[in-house]
Regions:
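Vicinal oxygen chelate
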Residues: 1-5, 27-80, 86-114, 124-127
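Conserved beta-strand-loop-alpha-helix junction that forms the acyl-donor binding cleft
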Residues: 10-13
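Conserved active-site tyrosine of GNAT-family acetyltransferases
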Residues: 16-21, 91, 118
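Short Gly/charged-rich anion-binding patches and loops
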Residues: 15-16, 86
Length: 127
């Protein structure tokens, strides 16, 4: 058994696709119209086998969960990077709002930013 796909709820699929591709650097894999929404997935660098779906957050329970996680400063996902300081500088230069600057946390150094679509995302670099 392996993980092939996971989802993030987003408040605007077009804005999310731009952010995850143009700012974070992921690659669009699928963008298929499905009724009033779209099936959008992106992949990370060198990881065509693992997809992140940018799901429309139209479910009231999903919205409540997303808002509660954001309000409590809890990241909804974590992405590993090779050089967290370089990524912090690069993303800050692109206007990304960090809620936590890089800091050591045991076996990793981590930082947290807003994805502009209702989620907090953690970046981490193994120490």
């Amino acid at each position: 058994m392996r993980i092939k796909l996971t989802s993030l709820m987003v408040d605007d699929q077009s804005k999310a696709l731009r952010f995850y591709t143009d700012v974070l650097g992921f690659t669009k894999k699928h963008d298929i119209p499905v009724g009033e929404y779209r099936w959008i997935t992106v992949t990370g660098e060198g990881r065509d086998d693992l997809e992140l779906a940018l799901e429309p957050n139209s479910n009231p329970a999903g919205k409540a969960f997303q808002e509660a996680m954001f309000a409590q400063s809890i990241p909804i996902a974590a992405f590993e990077v090779g050089d967290i300081q370089a990524e912090f500088r690069r993303l800050t230069a692109h206007g990304v709002a960090f809620t936590r600057e890089p800091m050591p946390a045991g076996p990793v150094t981590l930082a947290v930013f807003s994805d502009t679509c209702g989620n907090l995302i953690q970046l981490y670099q193994p120490n």
